Amino acid sequence: MPLVLFTGYPCSGKTTLAKHLVQLLQSKIDATPSLSKYSITYHSDESLGIKHSDYITSQDERKLRSEIISAVKRDLSKNKIVIVDSLNYIKGFRYQLHCEVKNLSTTFCVIQTLCPPETIFEWNKTSNPNPWEPELLNQLIQRYEEPNSSNRWDSPLFAILTPQDNITDYIDDICKVVFQTSKSAKNSGHNDPLSKGLQKPNSATVLKPASQSNFIQVLDIETSKIIKTIMNHIKSLTSIGGVSNGTRVIVSEGITDINDDGCFFVDLPIGNVVTLAQLQRLKRQFINFNKLRDIDQDRIGPLFADYLNKNLN
């Protein structure tokens, strides 16, 4: 049965999602008699004895990757779902795991947790019982190699924004991938109700970039409009000797009535002056977090304004 591979920054909510997924999949198995032969094995850094310090040097990292590979080889089988909850941030390693799955003619999916670095550092400080050293945490964020759904070893890819998404919203599509029949099962007439007709991942089972081929360009254009509006507001106040700190900037195009449901705005922080470099950095983060999500164009502006309000204040 499949390998479900979690990937993401440290302290981005992977373990919470992975354990919730175990519960949801087990509930599916318990509620579906024809799935009763399936079992779930969950592996994490903690269960495999991998410590934070093992990520410091490349030599130690090779050892921890060997631990994960060994666990997958040992446990992956026709009737066992293996969930790996680790950083898995090197694309070559994800490819290696994909090859192990392919050798068994079973299925595979990647679940990526997306989370703003500011939130990660806050969670690490306030909510993590075993916090990462800030310097190592920052290094691992810089090292991270983003999965790409166009690569077969990163597909099917489910990208989940942990501060606001819930894995229950994705569970039906994940189940369609997890419980699809393997080649051998197909030949033997296997007929699980959750896998019927799902021999290959398709648009119903995979979270892919939005339908527009230029979606990233659309994200860039819409977010750039908002940044331009904010910078023009700051410049206009500065030119007359005013102060932009603590002011509200309406960034909705063509709608200026604050009581209108279509109006959205950005509140500039009181304590410091917002710079173009700061806005561009937040824009890049926003695009990176949303490039795999299916967002209507008219929702990009309000979502980006909300993202700025959360990260500027």
From Swiss-Prot:
Family membership noted in the UniProt record: Belongs to the KTI12 family.
Gene: KTI12
Cellular compartments annotated: Cytoplasm; Nucleus
UniProt xrefs under InterPro entries: KTI12/PSTK, P-loop_NTPase
Highest taxon listed in the record's lineage: Eukaryota
Organism, as annotated: Saccharomyces cerevisiae (strain ATCC 204508 / S288c) (Baker's yeast)
Other noteworthy facts: Present with 5260 molecules/cell in log phase SD medium.
Gene3D superfamilies, per database record: P-loop containing nucleotide triphosphate hydrolases
GO biological process, one term: tRNA wobble uridine modification
Alphabetic keyword roster: ATP-binding, Cytoplasm, Nucleotide-binding, Nucleus, Transcription, Transcription regulation
Keyword Oxidoreductase: no
Function: Elongator complex-associated factor that is not a structural subunit but rather transiently contacts the complex. Regulates elongator complex gamma-toxin target (TOT) activity, resulting in G1 block by Kluyveromyces lactis toxin zymocin (pGKL1 killer toxin), probably through regulation of the ELP1/IKI3 subunit phosphorylation state. Required for an early step in synthesis of 5-methoxycarbonylmethyl (mcm5) and 5-carbamoylmethyl (ncm5) groups present on uridines at the wobble position in tRNA.
SUPFAM superfamilies per UniProt: P-loop containing nucleoside triphosphate hydrolases
Subunit record text: Interacts with the elongator complex.
Listed name of the protein: Protein KTI12
GO molecular function, one term: chromatin binding
Major localization class: cytoplasm
